[in-house]
Amino acid sequence: MHVTAITMEDTSFPYRLGTECAEEIVARLGERAASRYLVVCDTTVAALYGRDLVARLEKDAGPAVLLTHPAGEVHKRIGTVGDLAEQALAAGADRRSVVVALGGGITGNIAGLLASLLFRGITLVHVPTTVVAMLDSVLSLKQAVNASFGKNLVGTFYQPAEVLADTAMLRTLPARELRSGMGEVVKNALAIRPSMIERLAAELRPDARYEDAAMRWIIEESVAAKAQVTGADKHERRDGLVLEYGHTTGHAIEHAARGEVAHGAGVAIGMIVAAEVSRLLGHASGDLVGLHRELVAKAGLEGSVPALVDPADVKHWLTYDNKRGYMPCPPAATPMVLLSAPGEVLRSGPLPLVPVPLELLGRAVDALAAPAGQSAGAERLSPAPA
């Protein structure tokens, strides 16, 4: 497995990436000599990889137990963490146990929060099985779950000891999840690493059929992009906030859809909304909006708010965005990450955030929720009166 040292200010952990490397993953976990391996995954991943990993660990590493939770965003709740904690303790977990987060971003957050809470903190190792997890969520110290008021509102910061990623696990992903992952890849290219845009445009596949070599490049570039902004901001409260590009509206869409819209799909729409808002405010050109639409389409993602989502619900959840409080912002506005060009982030002082009137943001959301056959283009939007 190829290893990259992920350095965040005063802390560091190894990110190991390979293909067809299940045996090495078990060997690496075995080196930790855990009293018990607590393999956390959802019920879908349990059938695909969880039971096999537990059996391999039992054979070659030490005692292991499978802790499962129901699949889906609606189960990313503090109650799920509590249930898993009870399962772990009943199975004999102690301070020398290791939590193995086997799954996507939802499981990674649930397991990460679990590891931070058991005995006030035990070892956490990520074994990501989705694109979003491999190139985004496992590279963050943020461990959070949802509340009734919005996404990722309850959580903490906790460092994994290691990440062990096998791209072969992506072969069992449905196309929906692969496309979702590409939403985060497009974000990295547009907001952080514009040097990857040209090749990314050539590598993206609307049918979500990716060769191993292309996927390895996509993951490696995205890991480098994220490390570029978290190296000096491990808590993602300064420059690291750029990783929230597209997430203001994206999270609101996800929450309004009650788990029916994948994370990366929501982010893709959120980025187009953000580009439209930047254009309306006079910071960006229509070309930037067009580039967003082009890359989102090449990834096989929708460029408009899904019909199953009520735009009024989206606008409601925008008022609970988790970036509120980072900067002074009137009640009728919300802080957003906006671009003036690829890789060029607008700032208010030292932060990559600008206040956006909720009325203007709401009009951009409405424009992307146009009925089929009706344009949601720039002609339907005009700047708010001065």
From Swiss-Prot:
Cofactor section: NAD(+); Co(2+)
Keywords, ordered alphabetically: Antibiotic biosynthesis, Cobalt, Lyase, Metal-binding, NAD
Enzyme Commission no: 4.2.3.124
Catalytic activity: D-glucose 6-phosphate = 2-deoxy-L-scyllo-inosose + phosphate
Biological pathway: Metabolic intermediate biosynthesis; 2-deoxystreptamine biosynthesis; 2-deoxystreptamine from D-glucose 6-phosphate: step 1/4; Antibiotic biosynthesis; paromomycin biosynthesis
Entry annotation: catalytic residues: 142, 244
Residues that, per the record, bind NAD(+): 42, 73-76, 105-109, 129-130, 140-142, 151-152
Protein name according to UniProt: 2-deoxy-scyllo-inosose synthase
Organism the protein comes from: Streptomyces paromomycinus (Streptomyces rimosus subsp. paromomycinus)
